[in-house]
A protein has these predicted regions:
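Cyclic nucleotide-binding regulatory module and flanking cytosolic helices
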Residues: 1-32, 81-85
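Glycine- and acidic-residue-biased ligand/ion/polar-headgroup-sensing regions
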Residues: 33, 44, 48-57, 73-74
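Short phosphate-coordinating micro-motif centered on Lys-Gly-acidic
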Residues: 36-41
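Short alpha-helix-to-loop micro-motif enriched in aromatics/charged/Gly
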Residues: 61-68
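Cyclic-nucleotide recognition modules
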Residues: 68-126
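Polybasic "coupling" helices that flank or enter modular domains
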Residues: 115-161
Length: 163
């Protein structure tokens, strides 16, 4: 796939911004199990999945992994660039759930685009709201529903999705 097809705001960038993005974007093939972003230890940038699957999770105080959301083809992960956003104060780890190909817009490039391009700023706000909604749904499930109710819901989803 071409960069133009994967970057959601590509058509709304100026020619100069598009050229800088083409020159600075990183393309990586990552193996299953690879940690792509390790919380506050990294400030990776905006990650876009070209192929494969990623998982965003956090660790509880007792070391349990809590999956916040998954990312599939053409999904983007903003929390790997959370260091450029004020008031984002939680640890998110991004792991490849299968062999994957990802694009990364480096933090410095993405931060510049947020400040100079209204479409990129709007995309960022929309993505942040969407991911916040995902995280809140997970928290609601964990805090307000028993394990047996969550397991029953998961099993019914699996049953419905089978051919």
């Amino acid at each position: 796939m071409q960069i133009e097809e994967l970057v959601p705001f590509w058509a709304k960038l100026t020619k100069e911004e598009q050229e800088e993005l083409k020159n600075r974007i990183l393309v990586q093939n990552v193996k299953k199990g690879t940690i792509i972003h390790n919380g506050s230890e990294d400030c990776t940038g905006l990650i876009i999945v070209e192929e494969g699957q990623l998982r965003a999770y956090t660790l509880s105080e007792d070391g349990k992994e809590i999956t916040l959301y998954r990312m599939f083809q053409r999904d983007a992960c903003l929390f790997a660039a959370s260091c450029i956003m004020n008031n984002i104060q939680f640890e998110v780890i991004i792991e490849a759930r299968e062999d994957s190909k990802v694009l990364t817009i480096p933090t410095s490039v993405y931060q510049n685009l947020i400040h100079t391009s209204l479409p990129v700023a709007n995309f960022t706000n929309d993505l942040m709201a969407s991911r916040f909604s995902d995280v809140m749904w997970v928290m609601e499930q964990i805090l307000n529903k028993s394990v047996d109710v969550r397991l029953a819901a998961l099993l019914s989803l699996i049953h419905i999705s089978e051919p």
